[in-house]
Amino acid sequence: MLLSVPLLLGLLGLAAAEPAVYFKEQFLDGDDWTNRWVESKHKSDFGKFVLSSGKFYGDQEKDKGLQTSQDARFYALSARFEPFSNKGQTLVVQFTVKHEQNIDCGGGYVKLFPGSLDQKDMHGDSEYNIMFGPDICGPGTKKVHVIFNYKGKNVLINKDIRCKDDEFTHLYTLIVRPDNTYEVKIDNSQVESGSLEDDWDFLPPKKIKDPDAAKPEDWDERAKIDDPTDSKPEDWDKPEHIPDPDAKKPEDWDEEMDGEWEPPVIQNPEYKGEWKPRQIDNPDYKGTWIHPEIDNPEYSPDANIYAYDSFAVLGLDLWQVKSGTIFDNFLITNDEAYAEEFGNETWGVTKASEKQMKDKQDEEQRLKEEEEDKKRKEEEEAEDKEDEDDRDEDEEDEDEKEEDEEDTTPGQTKDEL
């Protein structure tokens, strides 16, 4: 069967538009994830990941992910996929993070490694290609890391991208394009974008200060100068402090015992401070001298800053003080639209019901605490009333005793008489 040229081109176009999905993990097959993910044995006390949807969720099955389960631990877990290079194509890295433990200090990022990584020996110093995701530690660190390894050096972004710091699930997306531009999205909304060359110090600067240039000796940068015609008034100089004219020597002052009496000093009302001549515009002012720049001979453009020869492993290599973070919905692809759609079909579908469940739990907890508080107050009031009743009974007994004593004493006296 022969196909027409337009139809053939259309089919080829559809094939070309098909997204390449290099890695996708949603943990929808129970414990089978343990066959795909490898624990590092570099340290014997790495923390353990467990499969969990957490204390609250939008869908108990769909929201299951890898959860950190031990406090104050390093974690090192990774999954391998078919190696690929992003040369000539877009790279999209996406995943969800939920810090349901209200994290105080810990990482929520991922690392992409080359195929040479020994997964069973993965650790904090293992060389990676890209590190991306949220990192929180106290009030001072709440950022999204975007770190590229360029020629063996880890290069941090020059911008500060703030991460989400609540207890809900959030979608993090990094897009790296072959035109050396990038985009960072949180919850499918752009929070940062720009040029790799501009926002990271991969390359030496294009321009440098001309080493042969120097500011001319007669270059005057003073906008104002002292008025040469101005002079200090003759009566300007007055002492800052003077003896108090109203002070009097105490009548009982004994100079032989107390020494010579000196009046206390006070601020001089006529003191004017240091005299300075008035300022006038400098007729020789030339402005601030700007060091001329020249092309940096060490600068060489690199059209392939974005590109890596090998991506083959996604790893969770992080530290957490308080455990409970859940990682889910991992995706590595070359298609921005597909990643956005995948985010909407996963995080986007369950986010509202997740919040509803959390709100319901919070309300139930609030009511429980109110009931417990009410019960505690009632018990305290009952105890107070019981103590008060006991005191009243004691007082009544004391009164009766006193009355009996008063009645008995006169009778005894009469009998004795």
From Swiss-Prot:
An alpha-D-glucoside binds at residues 109, 111, 128, 135, 317. Can be divided into a N-terminal globular domain, a proline-rich P-domain forming an elongated arm-like structure and a C-terminal acidic domain. The P-domain binds one molecule of calcium with high affinity, whereas the acidic C-domain binds multiple calcium ions with low affinity. The interaction with glycans occurs through a binding site in the globular lectin domain. Residues 237-270 are annotated as: Interaction with PPIB. Residues 309-417 are annotated as: C-domain. Residues 207-251, 352-379 have a biased composition (Basic and acidic residues). Residues 1-17 form the signal peptide. Calcium-binding chaperone that promotes folding, oligomeric assembly and quality control in the endoplasmic reticulum (ER) via the calreticulin/calnexin cycle. This lectin interacts transiently with almost all of the monoglucosylated glycoproteins that are synthesized in the ER. Interacts with the DNA-binding domain of NR3C1 and mediates its nuclear export. Involved in maternal gene expression regulation. May participate in oocyte maturation via the regulation of calcium homeostasis. Sequence repeats lie at residues 191-202, 210-221, 227-238, 244-255, 259-269, 273-283, 287-297. A motif (Prevents secretion from ER) lies at residues 414-417. It is found in: Endoplasmic reticulum lumen; Cytoplasm, Cytosol; Cytolytic granule; Secreted, Extracellular space, Extracellular matrix. GO terms for molecular function: calcium ion binding; carbohydrate binding; unfolded protein binding. The modification N6-acetyllysine is found at residues 48, 159, 209. This is Calreticulin. It holds the Pfam family Calreticulin. Belongs to the calreticulin family. The lineage of its organism: Eukaryota, Metazoa, Chordata, Craniata, Vertebrata. Residues 191-255 are annotated as: 4 X approximate repeats. The modification N6-(2-hydroxyisobutyryl)lysine is found at residue 64. Residues 198-308 are annotated as: P-domain. It comes from the Eukaryota. Residues 259-297 are annotated as: 3 X approximate repeats. Residues 252-261, 380-408 have a biased composition (Acidic residues). InterPro entries: Calret/calnex, Calret/calnex_CS, Calreticulin, Calreticulin/calnexin_P_dom_sf, ConA-like_dom_sf. Disulfide bonds join 105-137. One of its GO terms (biological process) is protein folding. Residues 193-277, 350-417 are annotated as: Disordered. Keywords: Acetylation, Calcium, Chaperone, Cytoplasm, Cytoplasmic vesicle, Disulfide bond, Endoplasmic reticulum, Extracellular matrix, Hydroxylation, Lectin, Lysosome, Metal-binding, Repeat, Sarcoplasmic reticulum, Secreted, Signal, Zinc. It comes from Cricetulus griseus (Chinese hamster).
